[in-house]
């Protein structure tokens, strides 16, 4: 059957947003509206007589032809049992309902009736004070059942397995407040003097000792962090003369700690100093103030002055950068100029670690040190051919001028 022969259900309610592009029919005169309740055919329509769709039995189920919409109310009223409750199924073979009389499984004191076919239907109905039937959601039924069962378990002791093991600390009171009070099935812990939370077990000394130890370690770390911040807040960079913690950008509020020096520098300034190519290599690696050579700079958000703390910071720095790939080695495609002194990881593309070779150095005539990745004879020949000799030409010109002056002075008359 074409979809154009089926009436659009959204058009019936006046909320079809597709309009003329809708695949279903918007003509009530020529279309075949489907008004049969599919939930009634499954045996679980929660609306009963108030349902807007036709309650017609599917072919092959039940006895007789499908019931008409006009006699739907009379047949359902005659088949339903007296008293309040959800509409029952109009089948010939009615199964005996199951009555649960455990008060701990219900939100009130009344027993709940469940049928094998219509358990989902009966769970969606409850009794009101005026005798009418009111459907509610599954979430409310589950929540009310859990609250009632938890309260009954705490008062009557219906869960003996909880008494055999150590009771759990109440997570609600540990988070701040427990709304169940004395009816809470969990154990309310005592307050910890360090973290100020109700998480201490009143009868388990091992749990108390473990939690207090954990809190003490966290408290000591917080105190060390507070002391480090207090020690670092007034440090001034020796290059830009600005307080490091008062810089405008948060990324600039970091210290560049030299490995062999105790002078204060911000990370950006000391890195710019060590990247100046016009200076000698020994001068670039030295401190701008005391000229002590430091092999590397350690970035840190706190200022560290004690030597033991600096050594610990150096080890953490080396351990951190050793997990990063070296950009000069480039997974075996390049050569690292630092060789075995490189702090970064030298590994190939397949994950194998490489043993870096010792770098070869070359000292030029000007005193500059250059790293040689590969030494070839053609490199020396090419360098000699393109080498300029400005000093030799200047010396020849000076000697020529001096010879001309001497020859002119000797030819002059006395």
Swiss-Prot record:
**Per the record, which residues fall in region Makorin-type Cys-His?**
192-221
Metal-binding in keyword set: yes
Region Disordered: start-end pairs: 57-94
Q: What is its EC number?
A: 2.3.2.27
Disulphide bonds in the chain: none
Q: What class of enzyme is it?
A: transferase
Name where it's found: Cytoplasm; Nucleus
Q: Which UniProt keywords apply?
A: Cytoplasm, Developmental protein, Differentiation, Metal-binding, Neurogenesis, Nucleus, Repeat, Transcription, Transcription regulation, Transferase, Ubl conjugation pathway, Zinc, Zinc-finger
Q: Name one Pfam family in it.
A: zf-C3HC4
Q: Where is the composition biased (Low complexity)?
A: 73-82
Segments forming RING-type zinc fingers: 237-291
Please describe what this protein does: E3 ubiquitin ligase catalyzing the covalent attachment of ubiquitin moieties onto substrate proteins. Inhibits neurogenesis and axis formation during embryonic development by modulating the phosphatidylinositol 3-kinase (PI3K) pathway. Acts downstream of PI3K and akt1 to up-regulate gsk3b mRNA expression.
Protein name as catalogued: E3 ubiquitin-protein ligase makorin-2
């Amino acid at each position: 059957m074409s979809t154009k022969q089926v009436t659009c259900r959204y058009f019936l309610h006046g909320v079809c947003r597709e309009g003329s592009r809708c695949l279903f029919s918007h003509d009530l005169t020529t279309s075949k509206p489907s008004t049969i309740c599919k939930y009634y055919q499954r045996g679980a329509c929660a609306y009963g007589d108030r349902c807007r769709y036709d309650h017609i039995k599917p072919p092959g189920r039940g006895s007789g032809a499908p019931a008409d919409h006009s006699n739907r109310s009379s047949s359902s009223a005659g088949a339903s049992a007296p008293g309040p409750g959800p509409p029952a199924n109009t089948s010939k073979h009615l199964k005996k309902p199951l009555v649960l009389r455990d008060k701990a499984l219900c939100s009130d004191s009344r027993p709940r009736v469940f049928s094998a076919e219509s358990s989902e239907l009966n769970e969606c109905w409850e009794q009101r004070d005026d005798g009418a039937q009111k459907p509610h959601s599954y979430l409310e039924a589950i929540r009310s059942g859990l609250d009632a069962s938890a309260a009954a378990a705490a008062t009557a002791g219906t869960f003996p397995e909880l008494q055999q093991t150590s009771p759990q600390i109440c997570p609600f009171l540990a988070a701040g407040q427990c709304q169940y009070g004395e009816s809470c099935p969990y154990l309310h812990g005592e307050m910890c003097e360090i973290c100020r939370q109700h998480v201490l077990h009143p009868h388990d000394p091992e749990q108390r000792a473990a939690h207090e130890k954990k809190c003490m370690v966290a408290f000591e770390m917080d105190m060390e962090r507070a002391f480090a911040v207090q020690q670092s807040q007034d440090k001034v960079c020796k290059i830009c003369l600005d307080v490091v913690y008062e810089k405008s950008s948060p990324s600039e509020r970091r210290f560049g700690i030299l490995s062999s020096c105790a002078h204060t520098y911000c990370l950006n300034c000391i890195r710019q100093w060590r990247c100046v190519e016009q200076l000698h290599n020994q001068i670039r690696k030295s401190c701008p103030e005391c000229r002590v050579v430091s092999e590397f700079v350690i970035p840190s958000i706190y200022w560290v002055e004690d030597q033991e703390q600096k050594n610990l910071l150096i080890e953490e720095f080396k351990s951190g950068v050793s997990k990063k790939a070296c950009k000069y080695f480039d997974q075996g495609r390049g050569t690292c100029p630092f060789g075995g002194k490189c702090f970064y990881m030298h590994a190939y593309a397949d994950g194998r670690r490489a043993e870096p070779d010792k770098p070869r150095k070359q000292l030029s005539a000007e005193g500059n040190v250059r790293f040689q990745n590969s030494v070839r004879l053609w490199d020396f020949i090419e360098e000699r051919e393109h080498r300029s000799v400005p000093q030799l030409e200047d010396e020849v010109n000076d000697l020529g001028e001096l010879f001309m002056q001497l020859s002119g002075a000797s030819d002059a008359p006395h």
